[in-house]
Amino acid sequence: MNNKFETLDFYPLSKNKKRYSEGGLRKNSVNKISLPNKPLITIITVVFNGDKYLQETIDSIKKQNYKNYEYIIIDGGSTDKTLQIIKNNSSMIDYWISEKDEGIYDAFNKGLNLAKGDYIGIINSDDTYEANALEILAKYIALYPDIDFIFGSVKKHWGILHGYRPEKINYSWGFYSSHSTGFFIRNSSAKKIGFYNLKYKYHADYDYFYRMIVKEKMNGIATKKMEIFGNFRRGGFSSKVPWLKLLQDEIMIRYDNGQNIFLILFLLFYKLVFKITDIFKKTLQN
């Protein structure tokens, strides 16, 4: 598989000769469309063995005040009750598949390839939307018809993630509210960026945003702080990955995207010193 994707039109089909399972409204020839003053919004959930919270995620989508959306679920071949939950809710899911994949970003790419909406958003299988999330999004789409992407505020256990500060991207990834739950991108803009690069196992979203902002020079906006899209549960995908692997991914992304090598080395040194200092402090406290 190539490391770079030029367009969303050519994502490789599944390597499985036969999908394990698939379903949804599209399989019954029900296809939703964009309406005057009501753009179609695609919501994608990727899941693997997520039966603990998946129903809460689905329920939060059912409760949306704004109704012109399509919902896609990409399951990585779960072995718990995830597939049964999906089937129990198939009347409100536009399309779902359940098959083995190459990880979370492969699943994201499958969802992007299936999206028919004017805007696309991703919500993890343990997070939830506020009931007015898509209503707020639609308001911003109407106010800023030429904008490429929108970041909404997201609640975490310690407070609210808010804002969008693109000038920080060259030295920090903390320039936006949230990749999932709080981020929506115009479908046509997503096609220009391409897919998540599967070369990066843990931080392909950073590479995606770097290409979006630096390479493609796209324009985005953040909602007001209290215009909250959703709730981000504690302990996401990257929280389960060893710190050094995350750092390796970050350095590789910056290097591959042509950042100044001296800046990369400085950031590497800074983060190593910060981490060692943090470990030392925790050791003293114990």
Where do the PLM segments sit?
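Glycine-rich, basic loop-to-helix element that forms the pyrophosphate-binding segment
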Residues: 98-115
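Conserved nucleotide-sugar donor-binding catalytic segment
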Residues: 163-246
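Short aromatic/hydrophobic "clamp" motif used to bind/position activated sugar donors
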Residues: 120
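A conserved acidic beta->alpha catalytic loop
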Residues: 75-84, 124-127
